[in-house]
């Protein structure tokens, strides 16, 4: 199949040189699901915590899928929940997972549709698709391993590395002096940008912290802010205009995640780009965001939207409309997807999930680099096994 230079990642994936089950007789013969709880070293607070809408975050629920085919190919994927929902995602995944057995592992779209219909009564967004995410991601991992390629290469990578920024050093619970130390450490560790949380009850405190960070970084070093849906429309306009002096890459989630009209008005009114989308849980929701001109940067999250398959559709739509890409969290997956995006993306560096895997991503020159390992390039650590509280298996154990 001939591919044009501007073919999208979905086209590349479908044209990938992989053997089908018709040629190999391969079938999915074993599926294992696990629910692990990853503890955080320090409770984490953003604007929603300071205003009493949420409690500090102390752990992350990780839902893991391990899939093995008759020919011996394996795939690993995961979903997550940062607060309530992890056990529900795991329970739904457990109810639908036996539909995988006997399927051709290359028929990812067919399997996805089958899993959606297995849980049709609970919808096509939210927890229903987040339960499919670890399975879908594991199938893409397996597909790339079968091809003998990193996933990014299977998808037709535009680049071997992606510029990255650090989020975890600038949370609202972190004192300013420590934030400034974190900024220095991040730069020394090869990070290419810094994101600072905003949304303090006292808006002047946001400006004070932002001023100090910009002075520490210098005028040109990439800097972003994230309000975590804290502001109303009036406050967002006022704060957005005050922040234009700081030469920000973007203002993230200034409004409620589902306020498409408000984000569109804000994007039109401000010179600073608007970024949002991390809380959306389906292709259709992202379609509304993109077609509504509600953001300059789209921030889909593969585990939240249902896996790599819907993420690729979001990427395709975003690229057609000239939107920039800055995926949320899950850098282990999003590095590969970002590398396959035609416009230069940003990748969020979050070290929280590092203990789950035996391998780590390489940071250098402000960028995150794709390894030559096949698939996603990760194997589960013994620590991940120790944190696991629930497991279930289907099919013939390897």
From Swiss-Prot:
This is L-talarate/galactarate dehydratase. It catalyses: L-altrarate = 5-dehydro-4-deoxy-D-glucarate + H2O; galactarate = 5-dehydro-4-deoxy-D-glucarate + H2O; L-altrarate = galactarate. It comes from Salmonella typhimurium (strain LT2 / SGSC1412 / ATCC 700720). Disruption phenotype: Cells lacking this gene lose the ability to grow on L-talarate as carbon source, and are impaired in the ability to utilize galactarate as carbon source. Substrate binds at residues 46-48, 82-83, 195, 228, 348. Belongs to the mandelate racemase/muconate lactonizing enzyme family. Catalyzes the efficient dehydration of both L-talarate (also called L-altrarate) and galactarate to 5-keto-4-deoxy-D-glucarate (5-KDG). Also catalyzes the epimerization of L-talarate to galactarate; epimerization occurs in competition with dehydration. Is required for the utilization of L-talarate as a carbon source. Also functions in galactarate utilization. Is not active on other acid sugars. The record marks 301 as: Increases basicity of active site His. Homooctamer; tetramer of dimers. Its EC number is 4.2.1.156, 4.2.1.42. The active site is at residues 197, 328. The enzyme product is the enantiomer of the product obtained in the galactarate dehydratase reaction catalyzed by OB2843; the enzymes thus differ in their regiochemistry of dehydration. Competitively inhibited by tartronate. GO terms for biological process: amino acid catabolic process; carbohydrate catabolic process; galactarate catabolic process; L-altrarate catabolic process. It is an enzyme of class 4 (lyase). Mg(2+) binds at residues 226, 252, 278. GO terms for molecular function: galactarate dehydratase activity; hydro-lyase activity; L-altrarate dehydratase activity; magnesium ion binding.
């Amino acid at each position: 199949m001939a591919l044009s230079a501007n073919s999208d990642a979905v086209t590349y994936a479908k044209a990938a040189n992989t053997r089908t089950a018709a040629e190999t007789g391969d079938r999915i013969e074993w599926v294992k699901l696990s629910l692990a709880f990853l503890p955080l070293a320090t409770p984490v607070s953003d604007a929603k915590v300071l205003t009493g809408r949420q409690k500090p975050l102390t752990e992350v629920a990780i839902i893991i899928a391990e899939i093995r085919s008759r020919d011996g190919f394996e795939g690993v994927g995961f979903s997550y929940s940062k607060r309530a929902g992890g056990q529900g995602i795991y329970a739904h995944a457990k109810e639908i997972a036996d539909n995988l057995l006997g399927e051709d592992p290359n028929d990812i779209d067919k399997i996805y549709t089958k899993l959606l219909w297995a849980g049709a009564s609970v919808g096509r967004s939210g927890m229903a698709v987040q339960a499919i995410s670890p399975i879908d991601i594991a199938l893409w991992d397996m597909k790339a391993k079968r091809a003998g390629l990193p996933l990014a290469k299977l998808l037709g990578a535009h680049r071997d590395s992606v510029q990255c920024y650090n989020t975890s050093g600038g949370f609202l619970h972190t004192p300013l002096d420590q934030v400034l130390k974190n900024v220095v450490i991040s730069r020394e560790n090869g990070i290419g940008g810094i994101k600072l949380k905003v949304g303090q009850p006292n808006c002047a405190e946001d400006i004070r912290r932002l001023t100090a960070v910009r002075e520490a970084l210098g005028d040109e070093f990439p800097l972003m802010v994230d309000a975590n849906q804290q502001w109303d429309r009036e406050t967002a306009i006022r704060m957005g205009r005050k922040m234009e002096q700081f030469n920000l890459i973007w203002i993230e989630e200034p409004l409620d995640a589902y306020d498409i009209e408000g984000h569109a008005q804000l994007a039109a009114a401000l010179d600073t780009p608007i970024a949002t989308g991390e809380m959306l849980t389906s292709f259709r929701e992202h379609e509304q965001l993109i077609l509504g001109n509600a953001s300059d940067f789209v921030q889909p999250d593969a585990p939240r939207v249902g896996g790599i398959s819907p993420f690729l559709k979001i990427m395709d739509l975003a690229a057609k409309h000239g939107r920039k890409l800055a995926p949320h969290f899950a850098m282990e997956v999003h590095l590969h997807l970002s590398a396959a995006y035609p416009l230069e993306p940003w990748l969020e560096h979050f070290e929280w999930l590092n203990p789950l895997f035996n391998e780590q991503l390489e940071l250098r020159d402000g960028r995150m680099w794709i390894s030559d390992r096949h698939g996603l390039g990760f194997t589960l650590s013994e620590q991940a096994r120790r944190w696991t509280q629930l497991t279930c298996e289907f099919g013939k154990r390897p």
